[in-house]
Amino acid sequence: MKRLFLILVLITFPVFVFGQAKKPSLMVVPSDLWCNQNGYMTEENSMGEMVPVPDYRRALINNTDLLPVISRINGLMADRGFPLKNLESEIKAINSNSAETAAITSKDGATVKTSALEQLRQRAKADIIVQLTWTVNQTGPKRSVTYTLQGLDSYTNKEIATSTGTGEPSFTAELPVLLAEAVSSHMDEFCDRLQNHFDDLLQNGREISLNIRVFENSGDVDLETEYDGKELREIIEDWVYENTVEHRFNLADDSEVYMNFDEVRIPLYDDRGRAMAASNFARELEKYLKLSLIHI
């Protein structure tokens, strides 16, 4: 059992710490579309395939508009009571922290690579990612901004809210001001949708995906190994059933070496009232397997 490894898909481990308002924490980032249009993309190896990903660090360094724009959106969100994670600060913390690593290593030396984007989400622990896209329109001496805001659940990457529009033409040359003017009239509705999604999580649990893998060096142990007449995968599925909100989960696929669960609803708080992250849920499963099966 000690060689089983649990992976949380979209490996991000937000910890929920709520004040009385119980509002989700947000992190505003430039959208993939904006990064691609402005040349701030890079490539990372994902299971042997090179995939494009946004290069936020390079964008913040080289684009003088990006930081003021994000700061202005952060201000609008803060005015409505949302706790915020600062993109620039989180990136600096990752780069300066020698403990940060690009890989998760098991006790047996096997590794599961973690992308730079996953590291950022792990570090920031934001409940919702707000992606921002904007373009500047020129009409004679006046300028306006067309924008799109997308709220994404940080675990599932599902879009939960969107807002788009174009501000009134203005003589001002300051991009953050133009953007704020364009966004402000739609911000309350956008924030209401973010809050509605989070309220659903409070009632019905956080949706995550859970993957279980058996390392190649696991010897004779796999998910078909029997303990007291039950296969290991049956034992795992029973535990997931008992520990999800209203037993809501879906075993999408499984074999003797892997199990893929999706639509897994985990509680936001444990039995002691402490905030529960996806990593806590996975560790509880690991503890259960070690304690239950070591004596069988």
Model-predicted segments: where are they?
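Sec-dependent N-terminal signal peptides
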Residues: L4-F13
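Sec/Tat signal peptide C-region and signal peptidase I cleavage site
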Residues: V15-G19
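C-terminal/domain-edge helix-coil "capping" segments
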Residues: Q20-M41, K158-R248
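Extracytoplasmic
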Residues: A21-K23, T64, P68, R72, ...
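Solvent-exposed coil/turn segments that connect beta secondary-structure elements
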Residues: S31-W34, S89-E90, T135, Q150-Y155, ...
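N-terminal segment of the mature soluble domain
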Residues: T42-R123, I129, G229-K290
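Amphipathic beta-strand/beta-sheet edge segments enriched in Tyr/Trp
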Residues: I128-T172
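Conserved small/polar residues in nucleotide/adenosyl-binding loops
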Residues: I294-I296
